[in-house]
């Protein structure tokens, strides 16, 4: 989860988020090199006393500043497209969970089970126990098995919402009348927090998401107790 004054991303807990962090570093390195080159050229232009008033064209320079940006864009686009297709790829999910956005709470349905569904509301600040997080705790957590591919079906009952869990690299719009899907796989157990990331009304800030990733055996015990 995020911490006060944190400058970086949250710790990655899924293969997709790890790829996104690598892509971020790759792109930031390219941006840093371009910025350094531009600043260096500007400093040379401001400090040099040489002028070239008779120069009308420079085909070699024009060729370089046409080809070089194209190469840079390709170096950014190729890994970006690779991650984009990885995020859309869903191969034989072990579990499917349907998520519906409401004003202002989430409801979840485990479609592989006959009658396993519940609503998830934020716990008011006045009801929090010591050690619990303000505006992030819910009365019903989404319990999921770790190290297994899980498909999330996401939609909305009323207005636009967005189901987002940063540490898993997930952010999918919940649109009324449309069913979007995303896949997640967690590499380690734990609690992972998210929030609605689309302004949806006066209580938009009070729609937290809490995923509890547990080993498969613990998930089976939990699902049996819920039925």
From Swiss-Prot:
Binding-site residues, Cu cation A2: 196, 198, 200, 204
Record Gene3D superfamilies: 1.10.287.90, Cupredoxins - blue copper proteins
Catalyses which reaction(s): 4 Fe(II)-[cytochrome c] + O2 + 8 H(+)(in) = 4 Fe(III)-[cytochrome c] + 2 H2O + 4 H(+)(out)
Intervals, Mitochondrial matrix compartment: 46-59
Positions in the Mitochondrial intermembrane compartment: 1-14, 88-227
Any single GO BP term: ATP synthesis coupled electron transport
Membrane topology listed for this record: Multi-pass membrane protein
Binding-site positions, Cu cation A1: 161, 196, 200, 207
Subcellular localization(s) per the UniProt record: Mitochondrion inner membrane
UniProt keyword annotation of Isomerase present: no
Any one GO MF annotation of this record: copper ion binding
Cofactor dependence: Cu cation
EC number per UniProt: 7.1.1.9
Listed Pfam families: COX2, COX2_TM
Enzyme class: translocase
Record key words, sorted: Copper, Electron transport, Magnesium, Membrane, Metal-binding, Mitochondrion, Mitochondrion inner membrane, Respiratory chain, Translocase, Transmembrane, Transmembrane helix, Transport
Binding site for Mg(2+): 198
Record's keyword annotation contains Transport: yes
Annotated TM spans: 15-45, 60-87
Cofactor note: Binds a dinuclear copper A center per subunit.
Assigned GO CC terms: mitochondrial inner membrane; respiratory chain complex IV
Record-stated family: Belongs to the cytochrome c oxidase subunit 2 family.
General function of this protein: Component of the cytochrome c oxidase, the last enzyme in the mitochondrial electron transport chain which drives oxidative phosphorylation. The respiratory chain contains 3 multisubunit complexes succinate dehydrogenase (complex II, CII), ubiquinol-cytochrome c oxidoreductase (cytochrome b-c1 complex, complex III, CIII) and cytochrome c oxidase (complex IV, CIV), that cooperate to transfer electrons derived from NADH and succinate to molecular oxygen, creating an electrochemical gradient over the inner membrane that drives transmembrane transport and the ATP synthase.
Oligomer status and interactors: Component of the cytochrome c oxidase (complex IV, CIV), a multisubunit enzyme composed of 14 subunits. The complex is composed of a catalytic core of 3 subunits MT-CO1, MT-CO2 and MT-CO3, encoded in the mitochondrial DNA, and 11 supernumerary subunits COX4I, COX5A, COX5B, COX6A, COX6B, COX6C, COX7A, COX7B, COX7C, COX8 and NDUFA4, which are encoded in the nuclear genome.
Protein name: Cytochrome c oxidase subunit 2
Organism per entry: Neotamias cinereicollis
């Amino acid at each position: 989860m995020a911490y006060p004054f944190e400058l970086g991303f949250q710790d990655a807990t899924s293969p997709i988020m790890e790829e996104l962090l690598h892509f971020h570093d790759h792109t930031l390195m390219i941006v840093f090199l371009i910025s350094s080159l531009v600043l260096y050229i500007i400093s040379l232009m401001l400090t040099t006393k040489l002028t070239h008033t008779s120069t009308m064209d420079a085909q070699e320079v024009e060729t370089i500043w046409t080809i070089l940006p194209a190469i840079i864009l390709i170096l950014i686009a190729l890994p970006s497209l690779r991650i984009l297709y990885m995020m859309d790829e869903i191969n034989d999910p072990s579990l499917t969970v349907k998520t519906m956005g409401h004003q202002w709470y989430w409801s979840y349905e485990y479609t592989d089970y006959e009658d396993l569904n519940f609503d998830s509301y934020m716990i008011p600040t006045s009801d929090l126990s010591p050690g619990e997080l303000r505006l992030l705790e819910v009365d019903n957590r989404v319990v999921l098995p770790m190290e297994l591919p899980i498909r999330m079906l996401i939609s909305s009952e009323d207005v636009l919402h967005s189901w987002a869990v940063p540490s898993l690299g997930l952010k999918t719009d919940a649109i009324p009348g449309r069913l979007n899907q995303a896949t997640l796989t967690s590499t380690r157990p734990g609690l992972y927090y998210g929030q609605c990331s689309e302004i949806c009304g006066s209580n938009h800030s009070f729609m937290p998401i809490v995923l509890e990733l547990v080993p498969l055996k613990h998930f089976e015990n939990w699902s049996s107790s819920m039925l």
